[in-house]
């Protein structure tokens, strides 16, 4: 929890390791994907085993994602953080999308109204049979392909249903 940043843009960047490396992740604005992946890892720690530092980091990560309404730019909520964040994929590897972020936040018990637009996005992508399509894929980069892009996805459907259940219950 020591190095993950949750700022929304700073004038004076931190220096030293690891900030002097990977400038794309440690530039003036915290890396959205880095925040999401840190939250994803910390959410797996059972609540009773989380240290105060872990809980503080989780709270900062949640707050960071909420000021961005999950998939928007905090300084202009009419713009997406990244266009790919509204195309649902599995597995995501280092990438992320609004569905993954919602899954992490709802797993952590968060159901803030600033999540609603992203939840509505999930609902809007459900087909008439209650399924969701695979819209983004790393197929061709693995030893085997995971489902077929553009077709209904068991994994996206499972994740979407879990998000909706956790958000509305």
Language model features: what each stretch is:
Residues 2-117, 133-169:
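An alpha-helical repeat/solenoid feature that recognizes helix-turn-helix modules
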């Amino acid at each position: 929890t020591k190095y993950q940043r949750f700022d929304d843009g700073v004038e004076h960047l931190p220096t030293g390791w690891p900030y002097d490396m990977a400038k794309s992740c440690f530039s003036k604005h915290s890396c959205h994907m880095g925040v999401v992946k840190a939250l994803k890892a910390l959410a797996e720690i059972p609540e009773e085993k989380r240290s105060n530092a872990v809980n503080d980091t989780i709270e900062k990560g949640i707050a960071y994602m909420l000021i961005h309404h999950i998939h928007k730019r905090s300084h202009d909520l009419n713009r997406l953080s990244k266009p790919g964040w509204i195309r649902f994929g599995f597995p995501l590897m280092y990438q992320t999308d609004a569905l993954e972020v919602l899954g992490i936040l709802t797993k952590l018990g968060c159901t803030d109204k600033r999540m609603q637009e992203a939840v509505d996005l999930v609902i809007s992508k459900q087909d008439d049979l209650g399924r969701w399509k695979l819209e983004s894929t790393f197929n061709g980069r693995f030893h085997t392909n995971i489902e077929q892009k553009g077709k209904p996805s068991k994994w996206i459907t499972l994740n979407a249903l879990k998000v909706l259940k956790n958000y509305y219950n």
